[in-house]
Amino acid sequence: MSANELPASAQSLQEQFLGSFVTRKLLLHDPFDHNSLRVFAVAPSPLITHENNLKGNVLMLLSVLICGIICCLGLHYIIRCAFRRSSRFMISEPISSLSTPRSSSNKGIKKKALRMFPVVSYSREMNLPGIGEECVICLSDFVSGEQLRLLPKCNHGFHVRCIDKWLQHHLTCPKCRHCLVETCQKILGDFSQADSMASTPTESVIVRIDPLEPEGRVNTFRESS
């Protein structure tokens, strides 16, 4: 007997059974099941994959080029600054080397002239007008027996070590500001004259004395008579 010949009640029962089976199967299906989604996922085409790889390579190449350009510009700037500084140093070095001897020569009094300034031994019984009770350079009192150097013309006295150090960098008296240039020039001029006189050899005059020729015999009066 075929299914078309089944009674209506049997067909209705069959339809109900199939409907309940389908609904139960749908209820058991998880919409968030990854395994089921994998079945329905569509595999990407090879053309899309190739385009994505090409874009990534282009971006990487551009980033490398930009980094290289930035590094080259920075290195060029550093080399340029270093070259400018070296050129300025080379230009200023000969000027400073030429100017330093003049400044150093005019900086203070020469030791040769300084040694010619008189030195006295201090005592409280001294009545020199230029010597006080203390050294104005180190601000310490004079003690009996200390060696003091007196400056010419103003006659101010100071400790030898103090005034020697002062006059290595100054040309004036630390107390009255009297200039010592003329005095030092005079002293150095006398020294240069003395040195020139000592260095020039004395001219020796050689006098040659020839022996006298023998004269003839002279007859005296007695012999003639």
UniProtKB/Swiss-Prot annotation:
Chief location bin: membrane
Protein family according to the UniProt entry: Belongs to the RING-type zinc finger family. ATL subfamily.
EC number, UniProt record: 2.3.2.27
Protein name, per record: E3 ubiquitin-protein ligase ATL76
Signal peptide: none
Function (record text): E3 ubiquitin-protein ligase able to catalyze polyubiquitination with ubiquitin-conjugating enzyme E2 UBC8 in vitro.
Reaction equations catalysed: S-ubiquitinyl-[E2 ubiquitin-conjugating enzyme]-L-cysteine + [acceptor protein]-L-lysine = [E2 ubiquitin-conjugating enzyme]-L-cysteine + N(6)-ubiquitinyl-[acceptor protein]-L-lysine
GO biological-process terms attached to the record: protein ubiquitination
Pfam families: zf-RING_2
Written domain comment of the UniProt record: The RING-type zinc finger domain mediates binding to an E2 ubiquitin-conjugating enzyme.
Stretches annotated zinc finger (RING-type): 135-177
Pathway in which the depicted protein is active: Protein modification; protein ubiquitination
GO MF term set: ubiquitin-protein transferase activity; zinc ion binding
Membrane-related topology note: Single-pass membrane protein
Residues annotated as transmembrane: 59-79
Subcellular location: Membrane
